[in-house]
Amino acid sequence: MSQSGKNGLTYSDAGVDIDAGNLMVEKIKPHVRSTRRPGADGEIGGFGGLFDLKAAGFSDPVLVAANDGVGTKLKIAIDADKHDTVGIDLVAMCVNDLVVQGAEPLFFLDYFATGKLDPDQGAAIVAGIAAGCREAGCALIGGETAEMPGMYSGGDYDLAGFAVGAAERGQLLPAGDIAEGDVILGLASSGVHSNGYSLVRKIVSLSGLAWDAPAPFGEGTLADLLMTPTRIYVKPLLKAIRETGAIKALAHITGGGFPENIPRVLPKHLAAEIDLGAIKPPAVFSWLAKTGGVAANEMLRTFNCGVGMIAVVPASEAEKVAAVLAGEGETVFTLGRMVARAEGAPGTIYKGNLAI
């Protein structure tokens, strides 16, 4: 029998506070309940989350799964003690990857790991996750909170998200009929989103600015503006897909920018010709480029530069698709067109100059 009593060790002595974990669960329950949707109406706390595909209205679905994190944007959240929006980023990075395949996000699970659990901090993070789930229309059906002393220093923590969606068989994207002359629509980003933050933090360090300093590129503090949540494009895109039937492909512009993300959804014989002059980058990108001396090509392969999502549509349907998206609050513009690609040529071609 193990030693017990006042001289015996407890789990708390090792740095794990079960009571703090239980307190956090109670704090997050209302946030989790707020994400309920057809197919998911259970409570958290079981060994697994449940989802009923039939109740969600699917007849012959194909499931689509994605997982992602927030990257070193979390270091800004930690250093600035601002934790209420990183959960939105976490959801956005996953569900935007689902919708580009034509899938409706159904449910989400999170993983939150920290060296020492702060129930209030954890609840703020999960509140953000729930907000992202509501915006995407998916249910938060479970998650894991891991308190791991010795694994993380100070107040550091990490997040991972897992999302599952579905599309009816035969309705997945990209479609097989992308053709030369198709139009590329750009959907504006809300800012840096959740990629390139190691470079962002390096540039901020070179600038000498503190996180609570007024941002040189907008209203608010540097931390507030750099922590602007990643835009969630799910509901507008699903509406455009279903109402127009004209979207042939979508690409989520994340790490690697245009050259790493657009070719992933294109056939080998086509390239995306991008008109850089059509982009109106948010002021943060000009500040990053000038303060860090970052060349335009490096900006384009690191950041979204103002375009968080692209859609490939027939030229004859571009105006209709853009109108549906604009009606749902998106800023949409003609970004380029599909052109022939020679064997071995890059999948993205630029014309014009980026206004940074």
UniProtKB/Swiss-Prot annotation:
Q: In which pathway does it act?
A: Purine metabolism; IMP biosynthesis via de novo pathway; 5-amino-1-(5-phospho-D-ribosyl)imidazole from N(2)-formyl-N(1)-(5-phospho-D-ribosyl)glycinamide: step 2/2
Q: Which InterPro entries does the protein's record reference?
A: PurM-like_C_dom, PurM-like_C_sf, PurM-like_N, PurM-like_N_sf, PurM_cligase
What Gene Ontology molecular-function terms does this entry list? Answer: ATP binding; phosphoribosylamine-glycine ligase activity; phosphoribosylformylglycinamidine cyclo-ligase activity
| SUPFAM superfamilies reported in the protein's UniProt record | PurM C-terminal domain-like (SSF56042), PurM N-terminal domain-like (SSF55326)
Q: Which Gene Ontology BP terms does the record give?
A: 'de novo' IMP biosynthetic process; adenine biosynthetic process
Q: Report if keyword Protein biosynthesis is assigned.
A: no
The primary location reported for this protein is cytoplasm
Catalyzed reactions per annotation: 2-formamido-N(1)-(5-O-phospho-beta-D-ribosyl)acetamidine + ATP = 5-amino-1-(5-phospho-beta-D-ribosyl)imidazole + ADP + phosphate + H(+)
Signal peptide extent: none
Subcellular location, in the record's words?
Answer: Cytoplasm
- What CDD domains does the entry give? PurM
Q: GO terms for CC?
A: cytosol
Q: Which domain of life is it from?
A: Bacteria
Say which enzyme class the record assigns: ligase
Identify the EC number(s): 6.3.3.1
Q: Which NCBIfam families match?
A: purM
Question: What HAMAP family is this protein classified in?
Answer: AIRS
The record's comment on protein family reads: Belongs to the AIR synthase family.
Q: What is this protein called?
A: Phosphoribosylformylglycinamidine cyclo-ligase
Per the UniProt record, the source organism is Rhizobium meliloti (strain 1021)
